[in-house]
Swiss-Prot record:
Manganese in keyword set: no
InterPro entries: GPCR_Rhodpsn (IPR000276), GPCR_Rhodpsn_7TM (IPR017452), Melcrt_ACTH_rcpt (IPR001671), MSH_rcpt (IPR000761)
Alphabetic keyword roster: Cell membrane, G-protein coupled receptor, Glycoprotein, Lipoprotein, Membrane, Palmitate, Receptor, Transducer, Transmembrane, Transmembrane helix
Organism field: Saguinus geoffroyi (Geoffroy's tamarin)
Glycosylation sites: N29
Protein name: Melanocyte-stimulating hormone receptor
Presence of keyword NAD: no
Membrane side Cytoplasmic: residue ranges: 64-72, 141-163, 212-240, 301-316
Compartments reported by the entry: Cell membrane
């Protein structure tokens, strides 16, 4: 298994990252000019992964325990937690295996190591795709619940949600297998980037439309009760702030990784791009951070889920 940087991680085509020498320092590019390189200690990376793992396991356990949470909306949230769990778990597994290989605690044939590496890469890629898909699915579910409130339960039935979930998992596994097999083709990386942009646009359009409807509804209530307009403005500002945080976190955590893939396609040998490639593990760490934040945004805001979570913790 490769030993450092992107060679240690997803997509073997990103194999230009050299060994980091400090936690935060200046590394030299091909011309000797300094470029900023941030090294994430393995201990910190594993710790963040463990936090994400525990957090998402609790979400899955709480939803599985409470039958009142067995609705289409919570099914999507549960699958988001499961995919986030796999994202953090697969990265932790690969990091742990590499550390064992480096220390000599794990000795095996090169072919076995390479097969394990490919399997982990497929798991990582498919769980990332699933995570993005379920973020989009949650946005669609909330959009339908607002704009088709009276028909929501007939549109988003549990069997229909289960079929959508199965389709997402199957498509993600098949796609990731193809992506890892043909990782050295630029079209593969571009497909991943386009998919991320499509999810970003989908979420932005749906949530902005939902915010506009919520502001319109609040304005109607204010007019009905003959209140002053500052209340409506305050509601609009709170909604805009919430939307900015939601989309901002998504973009900041996932964007650098897909920017990295874009640069691999368009400027693999450029000096500036080579400096960015050195921080590949930072981009993966941001994705792990997103898997920690997702439950706070989508799961723990539910009072019913928090109550069930307390029961789960007390039962242990």
């Amino acid at each position: 298994m490769p030993m450092q940087g992107a060679q240690r991680k997803l997509l073997g085509s990103l194999n230009s990252t050299p060994t980091a020498t400090s936690n935060l320092g200046l590394a030299a590019n091909h011309t000797g000019a300094p470029c900023l390189e941030v090294s994430i200690p393995d201990g910190l990376f594993l710790s963040l992964g463990l936090v994400s793992l525990v957090e998402n396991v609790l979400v899955v356990a709480a939803i599985a325990k409470n039958r009142n949470l067995h609705s289409s909306m919570y099914c999507f949230i549960c699958c988001l937690a499961l995919s986030d769990l796999l994202v953090s778990g697969s990265n932790m597994l690969e990091t742990a295996v590499i550390l064992l290989l480096e220390t000599g605690a794990l000795a095996t044939r090169t072919s076995v190591v390479q097969q394990l590496h490919n399997t982990i890469n497929v798991l990582t890629c498919s769980s990332m795709l699933c995570s993005l898909c379920f973020l989009g699915a949650i946005a669609v579910d909330r959009y339908i619940s607002i704009f088709y409130a009276l028909r929501y339960h007939s549109i988003m039935t549990l069997p229909r949600a289960q079929r959508a979930i199965a389709a997402i998992w199957v498509a993600s596994v098949l796609s990731s297998t193809l992506f890892i097999t043909y990782y050295d083709h630029a079209a593969v990386l571009l497909c991943l980037v386009v998919f991320f942009l499509a999810m970003l646009v989908l979420m932005a359009v749906l949530y902005v439309h939902m915010l506009a409807r919520a502001c319109q509804h609040a304005h109607g209530i204010i007019r009905l009760h003959k209140r002053q307009t500052p209340a409506h403005q305050a509601f609009g500002l709170r909604g805009a702030a919430t939307l900015t945080i939601l989309l901002g976190i998504f973009f900041l955590c996932w964007g650098p990784f897909f920017l990295h893939l874009t640069l691999v396609v368009f400027c693999p040998q450029h000096l500036t791009c080579s400096c960015i490639f050195k921080n590949f593990k930072v981009f993966l760490t941001l994705i792990i951070c997103n898997t920690i934040i997702d439950p706070l945004i989508y799961a723990f805001r539910s009072q019913e889920l928090r109550r069930t979570l307390k029961e789960v913790l007390c039962s242990w």
